């Protein structure tokens, strides 16, 4: 019988990342875990709908037994069974992030007995979660280099607070893992600006694009009007294609915040990324830790190691026989498997 791993949910960033990573790793390794003080660092601690959906989705995919799977719960016991491929559908029932639920269960399906398709309904454009286009255009090409083949499709947008969006991913079992090496970004090839609108004036998008164009040389400027029933909502994205990597950054528009201020937030974030030669942005770094650990080797460079990244590494090291090394030189941190 495998040992029970005890986790403190208040560790590190004190949010949902510890829970999501633990669920993924428990499903993969077969190790049960107990987590207390779930989301202790948040204004509303405990399981929200998005986290509860992730728990229930994980339990269904690996036939786990679970204690504490209810809204507001700050303690959870998860005993995994065998991961099985297949077709799955999960509904968050709010504007909670579809991609964070997918992020939780997809790694386990890399080890399933056959191909799978997972569809999640909920929020798609959430300020605290990666959008589907980030997964599709940035993360999945890198996963393919590691030997992980999955394809994400955004079927319907769902902005906060209404939700109603749908994201689906098709994934195949991994035959073998490759080593990922991501050092410097290299020269910029092109930059693309994009604005999504649903039930919002096109004039807002034009002002947002103008703000981006005032700071960067954009090779593409795209405005997409979505059906009104998918909003109201607005997101602004900027994609940076470089010689060695494509990165994507975004902000979600807010009520009573001007288009210029919204776009300026994005400009600031992209400039922060471009100020360093490191290939990997702050948010992408979080996503690379688990697949790199499963490969057992690899490295990347990031300018600003986030609390999410450090938390993720700490959880991975509890479940897998790997150790990460972080070495900072001239403002760039090299993250590698030791």
Swiss-Prot record:
Q: Does the keyword Cytoplasm apply?
A: yes
State its location(s).
Cytoplasm
**Pfam families, per this entry?**
RTC, RTC_insert
PROSITE patterns noted in UniProt: RTC
Q: Which spans are transmembrane here?
A: none
- For this protein, what reaction is catalysed? a 3'-end 3'-phospho-ribonucleotide-RNA + ATP = a 3'-end 2',3'-cyclophospho-ribonucleotide-RNA + AMP + diphosphate
**Catalytic-site annotation from UniProt:** 308
Q: Where does ATP bind?
A: 103, 283-287
Q: What class of enzyme is it?
A: ligase
GO terms classed as biological process: RNA processing
Known EC number? 6.5.1.4
State its role. Catalyzes the conversion of 3'-phosphate to a 2',3'-cyclic phosphodiester at the end of RNA. The mechanism of action of the enzyme occurs in 3 steps: (A) adenylation of the enzyme by ATP; (B) transfer of adenylate to an RNA-N3'P to produce RNA-N3'PP5'A; (C) and attack of the adjacent 2'-hydroxyl on the 3'-phosphorus in the diester linkage to produce the cyclic end product. The biological role of this enzyme is unknown but it is likely to function in some aspects of cellular RNA processing.
UniProt lists the family membership as follows: Belongs to the RNA 3'-terminal cyclase family. Type 1 subfamily.
In its UniProt entry, what is this protein called? Answer: RNA 3'-terminal phosphate cyclase
What is the organism field in this record? Escherichia coli O8 (strain IAI1)
The beginning of the lineage is: Bacteria, Pseudomonadati, Pseudomonadota, Gammaproteobacteria, Enterobacterales
């Amino acid at each position: 019988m495998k040992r029970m791993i005890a986790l403190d949910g208040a560790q590190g960033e004190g949010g949902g990342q510890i829970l999501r990573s633990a669920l993924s790793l428990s499903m993969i390794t077969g190790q049960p875990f107990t987590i207390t003080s779930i989301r202790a660092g948040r204004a509303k601690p405990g399981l929200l709908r998005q986290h509860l959906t992730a728990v229930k989705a994980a339990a269904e995919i690996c036939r786990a037994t679970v204690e504490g799977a209810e809204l507001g719960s700050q303690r959870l016991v998860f005993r995994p069974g065998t991961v099985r491929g297949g077709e799955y559908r999960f509904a968050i029932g709010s504007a909670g992030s579809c991609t964070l639920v997918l992020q939780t269960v997809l790694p386990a399906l890399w080890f399933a007995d056959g191909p799978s398709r997972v569809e999640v309904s909920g929020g798609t454009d959430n300020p605290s979660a990666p959008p589907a286009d980030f997964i599709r255009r940035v993360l999945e090409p890198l996963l393919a280099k590691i030997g992980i083949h999955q394809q994400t499709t955004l079927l319907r947008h769902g902005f906060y607070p209404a939700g109603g969006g749908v994201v689906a991913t098709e994934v195949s079992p991994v035959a073998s893992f490759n080593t990922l090496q991501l050092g410097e970004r290299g020269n910029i090839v092109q930059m693309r600006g994009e604005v999504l609108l649903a039930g919002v004036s096109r004039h807002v998008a034009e002002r947002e694009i103008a703000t981006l164009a005032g700071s960067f040389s954009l090779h593409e400027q795209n405005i997409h009007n979505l059906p009104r029933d998918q909003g109201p909502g607005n997101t602004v994205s900027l994609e940076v294609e470089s010689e060695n990597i494509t990165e994507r950054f975004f902000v979600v528009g807010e009520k009573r915040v001007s288009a210029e201020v919204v776009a300026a937030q994005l400009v600031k974030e992209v400039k922060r990324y471009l100020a360093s030669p490191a290939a990997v942005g702050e948010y992408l770094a979080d996503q690379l830790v688990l697949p790199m650990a499963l490969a057992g080797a690899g490295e990347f460079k990031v300018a600003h190691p986030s609390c999410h990244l450090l938390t993720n590494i700490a959880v991975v090291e509890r479940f897998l026989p790997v150790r990460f090394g972080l070495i900072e030189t001239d403002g760039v941190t090299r993250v590698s498997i030791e």
